[in-house]
Regions:
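Sec-dependent signal peptide recognition
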Residues: 1-9
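Short boundary/loop segments of OB/S1/cold-shock single-stranded nucleic-acid-binding domains
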Residues: 25-27
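Cleaved targeting-peptide boundary
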Residues: 17-23
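Covalent nucleotidyltransferase
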Residues: 19, 30-116
């Protein structure tokens, strides 16, 4: 029974922690002057949040990225989209769930925010 309580604690603490990151989400801008802003195309990939040590999903769950993939990531938080090419969302999602490191070479983390 203790094991069940412990697992529930881990589950809910991860969800709470994920919400604390306050990720930037898509929104519509109306009547705002966007002159001077930098904008990019919406990439159809998988959200990737690097906290300085671990690559996490939008939900705050660790992604099984191999060491070579994150070796050059900075020691601070970056937020972006794991992407390979258009119309490949299913493959991208599959790779981000896979422990097969060779497939990760197809992906790039396109950074769009540096929180804090």
């Amino acid at each position: 029974m203790r094991a069940i309580y412990f697992l529930l604690y881990l589950l809910f603490s991860q969800i709470t922690w994920a919400n604390e990151r306050d990720l930037m989400l898509l929104s519509t801008y109306e009547n705002q002057d966007v002159q001077g802003w930098v904008m990019s195309e919406k990439l159809d990939g998988v959200r990737g949040y690097w906290d300085g040590k671990t690559l996490l999903s939008r939900q705050g769950l660790p992604l099984p990225a191999p060491t070579y993939f994150t070796a050059q990531f900075p020691p601070f938080a970056i937020d972006g989209e794991l992407f390979s090419e258009r119309n490949q969302f299913e493959e991208i999602a599959s790779i981000t769930k896979s422990f097969k490191g060779d497939n990760w070479a197809k992906l790039t983390l396109y950074v769009f925010d540096v929180p804090n």
